[in-house]
């Protein structure tokens, strides 16, 4: 935003700008600011060229890139842990890491003390890949107590983001307090890339592409915001 002297003001969190500027707007991802304008230097949604390979070739390409990405991030100066929900994203990341690691990886899951279906699926994956698995059990009171600090750290009132962030915040808090792990790997973005349930109802391939691009373009306001804030506020990377 701009202050009363029309100077642009930046901060790492919106709440730091309250009272300094009249209007607060996010710094657009993939941009830098120079001479009064935002200049785009990268666009994750840009399609360089359409791909017409067969499905097997495309899947193999994705597989190779995912494996290389996980393997690269296993190189860290601090101990690495893994968030495991039992869903597609985190299960794939953990399975790849388990294969590439010389010893069992440490995985963490969180769930309520009643009807914890995510814990069940995470446990099945952990047993299959042979990880050193930890379950963090939370109660209704834990969730309610976490609500206010989670809203404060996110700087958003988006219901879905807040709801998804409570569990992540609490599991990261437990990891920081109870272990010496300081780097976390987690699975994100496969739903946005490949369409959520919207894929089933998209009227055309072009409309599906448009929706996928929109979800990727807005990631910094939702899933990336959740992961970044919940992890960093607990002194993790």
Where are these predicted regions, by residue range?
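ATP-dependent adenylate-handling active sites, centered on carboxylate activation for C-N bond formation
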Residues: 1-4, 47-237
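N-terminal segments that mediate ammonia production and transfer
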Residues: 1-56
């Amino acid at each position: 935003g701009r202050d009363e002297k029309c100077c642009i003001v930046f901060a790492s969190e919106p709440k730091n700008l309250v009272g300094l500027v009249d209007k607060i707007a996010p710094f657009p991802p993939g941009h830098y600011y120079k001479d009064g304008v935002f200049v785009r230097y990268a666009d994750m949604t840009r399609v360089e060229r359409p791909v017409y390979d067969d499905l097997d070739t495309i899947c193999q390409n994705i597989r190779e890139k995912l494996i290389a990405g996980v393997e690269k991030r296993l190189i860290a100066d601090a101990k690495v842990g893994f968030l495991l929900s039992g869903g597609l994203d985190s299960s794939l990341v953990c399975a790849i890491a388990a294969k590439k690691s010389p010893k069992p990886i440490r995985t963490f899951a969180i769930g309520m003390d009643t009807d914890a279906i995510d814990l069940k699926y995470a446990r099945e994956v952990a047993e299959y890949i042979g990880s050193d698995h930890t379950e963090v059990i939370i109660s209704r009171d834990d969730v309610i107590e976490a609500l206010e600090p989670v809203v404060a750290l996110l700087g958003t009132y988006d219901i879905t983001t807040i709801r998804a962030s409570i569990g992540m915040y609490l599991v990261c808090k437990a990891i920081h307090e109870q272990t010496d792990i300081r780097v976390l790997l987690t699975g994100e973005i496969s739903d946005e890339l490949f369409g959520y349930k919207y894929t089933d109802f998209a009227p055309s391939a072009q409309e599906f592409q448009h929706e996928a691009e929109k979800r990727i373009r807005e990631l910094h306001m939702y899933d990336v915001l959740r992961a970044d804030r919940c992890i960093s506020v607990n002194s993790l990377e």
